[in-house]
Design a protein with these regions (language model features):
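Active-site proximal loop and beta-alpha junction motif in alpha/beta enzyme cores
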Residues: 1-214
Length: 214
């Protein structure tokens, strides 16, 4: 949205576009990458780390075994306007086999856990990337998003909170969309300042369709 506004409504030289959304005003910035492509970044609104769940509770809902889930960090709900569950997995094989079962999820939904599930692991398709992920959500059945900005933002807060990396400042490349044949790359920057998570999510814009109203 911000890229379209900058290209067609605002000045193309604008360094920042601010989007007024339900969660508040979201700043979006633009920068050139090393390969001369343009990266678009949004700054996440404040996030809340909520209730946690167990591998035993979640494994069946994803068609996995308990041994597929990385129990070094909890399964946790993260919120910023919308909410999603962050689920750490041990392997890319487990990631590929993941599939959200809404019937099995009904008990968790009754406990207040949203049927929006972001699964990730440390194994990647390409060595220059850091994590691989999938995002499932309910929409007349189960759908899968090929690139999820808010999911990546939630992940950033989660990784900082649980000290998944030794540094308090993160710069991470996340693969997504391979299972739906739309491979995507999502960039994540995150840092802690006191008790506050500062998270930005970026990616390349690739125009695919253009129309004209007559």
């Amino acid at each position: 949205t911000a890229w379209v506004i900058r290209q067609h409504l605002a000045s193309s030289s604008a360094a920042e576009i601010r989007l007024n959304l339900e969660v508040g005003q979201v700043p979006v910035t633009f920068e050139s990458s090393d390969d001369e492509k343009e990266l678009v970044w949004f700054q996440s609104p404040p996030m809340t780390l909520g209730a946690t769940s167990t591998a035993e509770s979640f494994s069946e809902t994803l068609g996995l075994s308990v041994d597929d889930i990385d129990t070094r960090s909890p399964i946790q709900m993260i919120s910023a306007g919308t909410s999603a569950m962050i689920v750490p997995l041990l392997s890319q094989d487990a990631l590929r086999r993941s599939k959200l079962d809404l019937a099995a999820y009904s008990t968790l939904a009754a406990d207040g856990f949203p049927p929006l599930v972001y699964v990730f692991c440390n194994e990647t398709h390409h060595p220059e990337n850091d994590l691989c992920s999938r995002f499932f959500f309910e929409a007349h059945g189960v759908r899968e998003d090929p690139a999820t900005g808010n999911g990546a933002a939630f992940l950033g807060a989660y990784l900082l909170q649980h000290q998944a990396y030794p540094d308090s400042t993160l710069s991470i490349r996340i693969e997504q969309g391979y299972e739906v044949r739309r491979p995507s790359l999502v960039m994540l920057r995150a840092r802690m300042e006191g008790e506050h998570h500062h998270v930005s999510v970026g990616g390349y814009v690739i125009p695919t369709v253009q129309g004209e109203l007559l």
